[in-house]
Design a protein with these regions (language model features):
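N-terminal signal peptide
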Residues: 2, 9-27, 539-544
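Active-site groove signature of glycoside hydrolases
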Residues: 155-185, 212
Length: 544
């Protein structure tokens, strides 16, 4: 009995000690263009690896053996959250330690699941995590961009579920959303996501976790992209580049790293490789690591994240899972990467010394990129999605669309209804900087607005104007039935004052030719220039 008590007290003491260590675990702070440890002020460099198993590498059926069911619950999501399954993360942490990794990039987590075991175990191992706020089914679509309530609720849920872990290094508000000149307008929506995520963290009084963006390295857009996310009143806290220029046994000069380093030497926020590791040669020699963490680059870049941990069809992994899924097999890349990471020690600067350098530089003010045929993202950003406004659609409008099982029916419904009424109030255009009153609402809510407008246009109809079992007919609700606040004031009517049921000329959000850039004076004749031309013509007429 005495032995049992001694063991019990030892376990309690160990747990308490572990919790004390976690409470003292230093978070990573952004200061100027560097990352610093919050406790010592020592500069932090990422030695990271991308960590996201796919259904091909792990079973979607969570095993969760020997784990309390209240702690971890299986998920129906069509992606695997490695930070919510201790069988995955605890298996892999020893391999991370051998690699010399101090940062994981995880592209999608399930905010409904518990992450305590994995996040605390990573913390005990000195490993930080940088998280993407999106997930495959809920993200900003570069081809039809929107910053809507569905995506915003997802982002908030991830922030809510992960903010308490001190080893959360930061959040990505987007990843390669703009990837060439054809979709630069999508960046306006990502920048709005950066703005709202930062504001939300501040409003909730959470630890000041930085929010940034991860871009590709497209030659035509990289300069404008890098300026856009740090110009004006809304600025990303950090900027990651998915960089694959250095392949095999290249060099600082040949790879393009020299040019990129020169371009970003005065960048005002931390910049790093959010992915790197070209695989044209296998096994990868990772010779770029000596340059990235060496004197040629370490004064500009804050390290990087190797793509990736798991071997898949794309052949970027450093481990391959055996058939039982329980035993990672180290590939040749693993030992090379481990040797490379463990042998580099970048020259760091203290926060105190860096403060003096910042004082000399002064405040930065970057101009937003000029609009052109290569860059069309407007400086005017979409509004913060208003949950109350969007819910008012469901509470007050006569025709309410329920979620459709067949997703192709959404397009059919849009094509029909926008041919009957003016859909300008649900349009979102990052080129013109125009965002309709209900452009921030969900797809179902947007269609509900337009279906209801068509119903109201047809004065004698007693049903919704589109045959579907997924449309709930609520009729034209009386004012007395409208939702009210505690003071008895109507909540919703203010949102529908400008609703126009008549068919008018529509704003075409898909039209992205240069002629549409009149909102900021691109390829247009200014008022002053027109007056000059008129005076010139008058002079000619006088002479002749």
């Amino acid at each position: 009995m005495i032995l049992v008590k001694v063991i019990f007290m030892a376990i309690v003491s160990l747990l308490c000690r572990s919790q004390e260590i976690r409470n003292a675990f230093p978070s990573i702070e952004v200061y100027g263009s560097k990352f610093f440890y919050s406790d010592t002020g020592e500069q932090f460099f990422m030695k990271g690896i991308a960590y996201q198993p796919t259904p091909d590498s792990e079973s979607l059926e969570s095993k969760f053996t020997n784990i309390d069911e209240d702690e971890v619950k299986p998920t129906t999501k069509r992606y695997i959250d490695p930070l919510a399954d201790p069988n995955i993360c605890l298996r892999d942490i020893p391999y991370f330690q051998r690699l010399g990794v101090n940062t994981l990039r995880v592209y999608a987590i399930d905010p409904q699941l518990n992450h305590d075991i994995c996040m605390n175990s990573l913390m005990d191992s000195g490993i930080y995590v940088i998280l993407d706020l999106s997930e495959p089914a809920i993200s900003i679509n570069r081809d039809n961009p929107n910053w809507d309530i569905t995506i915003w609720e997802r982002y908030k849920a991830v922030i809510d579920s992960m903010n308490s872990y001190r080893n959360v290094l930061g959040f990505f508000a987007g990843n390669e959303v703009t990837n060439d000149k054809s979709n630069t307008d999508a960046s306006a929506f990502v920048k709005a996501a950066v703005r709202d995520s930062k504001n939300y963290i501040e409003e909730k009084n959470y630890r000041r976790i930085p929010v940034g963006y991860s871009t590709n390295d497209d030659i035509e857009t990289r300069s404008s992209l890098s300026k856009y996310f740090i110009c004006g009143d809304v600025k990303a806290d950090f900027y990651g580049i998915n960089m694959y220029e250095w392949c095999g046994y290249s060099s600082f000069e040949i790879s393009g790293y020299k040019e990129r380093t020169q371009e970003f030497k005065n960048y005002p926020v931390p910049i790093f490789f959010s992915e790197f590791g070209c695989n044209l040669i296998r096994p990868r020699p990772f010779t770029e690591i000596n340059a990235l963490y060496g004197p040629q680059m370490a004064n500009v870049w804050s390290g990087g994240i190797v793509y990736m941990y798991f071997e898949e069809e794309n052949k970027y992994g450093v481990v391959e899972l055996a058939k039982d899924k329980d035993t990672p097999r180290e590939l040749e890349d693993f030992e090379i990467l481990a040797t490379s990471f463990n042998n580099v020690s970048p020259l760091a600067i203290s926060k105190e010394n860096y403060t003096e350098i910042l004082k000399e530089k002064g405040e930065f003010n970057i101009n937003c990129p000029s609009l052109s045929h290569l860059w069309k993202a407007n400086e005017r950003l979409p509004p913060t999605p208003n949950k109350e406004k969007c819910e008012c659609i469901e509470l007050t409008q006569p025709c309410v669309l329920l979620p459709l099982e067949d997703k192709t029916n959404y397009k059919k419904m849009f094509d029909f209804i926008c041919g009957e009424v003016d859909c300008v109030d649900i349009k979102a255009d990052g080129v013109l900087g125009y965002y309709g009153d209900f452009s921030e609402c969900s797809v179902e809510q947007k269609l509900s607005v337009e279906l209801s407008k068509y119903f109201l246009k047809q004065e004698e109809m007693d049903k919704c104007p589109y045959e579907s079992k997924d449309i709930l007919f609520q009729g034209a609700k009386k004012t007395s039935n409208q939702p009210k606040n505690k003071q008895g004031e109507d909540i919703c009517s203010k949102y529908f004052k400008n609703l126009n049921i008549n068919k008018e000329k529509k704003v075409d959000s898909n039209q992205k030719e240069d002629s549409n850039l009149t909102s900021q004076g691109i390829i247009t004749i200014s008022h002053t220039y027109c007056i000059f031309i008129m005076l010139f013509l008058v002079c000619l007429l006088t002479i002749f």
